[in-house]
Amino acid sequence: MPDLLVRSFAPLLLAFQPCFTQPSFRSFWALAGAWILCSGRRSLTRIIQSGDLSQFKHFCSFHRFFSQARWNLDDLGRCVFHLLLPFCSPILIGAVDDTLARKSGRHIWGAAMHHDPLRSSKIRPVFSFGHSWVVLSVHLSFSFAPNKVWAIPILVRLYRKQKAKLAPGRNGKLERKQTGHATAQQYRTRPELALEMIRTVANWVPERKLRILGDSEYAGGSISRHLPANVELISRMVMGAALFEPAPTKPSRLGRPRKKGKRLANPAQMADNSKLRWTKTTLRLYGRSVKVWYKSIDVLWYSSAGQRLLRIVVVRDPRGHRRDDCFFSTDLTMTPSEILTTFSWRWPLEVCFRDVKQLLGFEDPQNRVSSATQRTAPFIFYIYDLVLLWYAQSGHRLAQQSLLQRLWYPQKATVSFEDMLRTLRHATWQERIFSDPALDAHTRKLLKPFVEWAKAMA
């Protein structure tokens, strides 16, 4: 197998060997190294070319690795999950969210028009053609950056729109073929896909508590009413939600027992009620200290969570820069401050989406086959995970050698994924070039500037 990367990266790749047959594992090993070292557009043919993989296998073997080989994405996610457990706290923190990978072309399998949050505004929604991926990640901090939270994707699902009966285009022709759209029997919503992944992770560690973070799309009954016993949900609540007291324990009359008590004020009314005093505090949210006011109460949100009691927290920005908001947790042991602080851990997943798109070419592969489409993009998330794990285990010791000095950014104090990727590439180039004992001192001196230039371009 080609040793494209630094030797300290090999144990991480070997951990995935049980997930593959021997030929597929050799392809996985080669593709992982070539993908990390590749720069520019990352189509599969360019990955093969940049790693010179045609010297190792026929190029068709790497296409078949995604379209025909026998391996399962969830097995890779489980391997990553077990590699992460030594870094995790006793209570696991996870998050679910979706991201859009924009595509172009009539024959892209599973692509459709989806809402594009990056191009949309509050007034004008924008839709883009592409794939919508639902991702479940584990969130944690590493010892080399204890104040920073990282999102590690472990499970990924492709959301497929339901096949439309009619899709007219110009002059009565279809503008795009409906390739890979789900039938009525195959169709599942994004929350249903998220619940499937939550149950999978909960079954991997039934003895551990798992707290799942999600935005308002994942706060509905599709998830909150069907959570496994060891899973708690922290999410955002609409300000107009209908809230109720718990049902009385003793029925006051004959007939069916009540499922909910009397109607309470909704979160918007709670925020405007001057008789309920705000609790004022300062919390560490999104990497900085923020002053917040909040009101908290335990209620039923029957339309979403049924008879499960929730702890809701209505939040106000005392500076008036943000509108009032409301969050809830199914875990009644959490304080309001813990709920708000923990929910802020959801943001690193958005940073992860940005990194895989801009630094690893998440939107670049163009697939026309079902299995290749559902494997190639998630494969990039696992490349992201491997780089993070390598840096946490050994790469952080090499950070000073690979540090890129920016005169316009002297206050930089935390490491980014871009820094990790540069460190891995720099360590690889140094090992591959300078590990040759035949090189004399003069040749090493000549080659050193080229490695530094390559580091600056990485």
Would you name each region that the model predicts?
Residues 1-67:
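Gly/serine-rich nucleotide phosphate-binding loop at the start of the catalytic core
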Residues 68-165, 296-300:
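Active-site-proximal, Lys/Arg-enriched surface segment
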